[in-house]
């Protein structure tokens, strides 16, 4: 089983991760990230918005099994994170989350 928190940290430190709902949506419209992670407690409107743009871009979505507060803590950030986009995983194996989901 993949440790989501550790792999997310490795992706942030060695790759490129876009944090935030608005920025994630922009990246789906312009750059097509490799993976989108959304918090389990994201509001329905936000989830539907991200799912729509991810489907258009052909990007897989992984639902983080915790709240936006826990996703922020996993990313070592002092705030809530509703969604993030992995543009470059770096040395992490975070893209394997999609295979296990």
Swiss-Prot record:
Gene Ontology biological process: translation
Recorded GO MF terms: RNA binding; structural constituent of ribosome
Domain of life, per lineage: Archaea
Entry keyword annotation includes Signal: no
Sorted UniProt keywords: Ribonucleoprotein, Ribosomal protein
Alphabetized InterPro entries for the sequence: Ribosomal_eL30, Ribosomal_eL30-like, Ribosomal_eL30-like_sf, Ribosomal_eL30_CS, Ribosomal_eL8/eL30/eS12/Gad45
A Gene Ontology term for the protein's cellular component: cytosolic large ribosomal subunit
Listed SUPFAM superfamilies: L30e-like
Record keyword Ribosomal protein present: yes
PANTHER family per UniProt: RIBOSOMAL PROTEIN L30 (PTHR11449)
Similarity comment: Belongs to the eukaryotic ribosomal protein eL30 family.
Protein name as it appears in the record: Large ribosomal subunit protein eL30
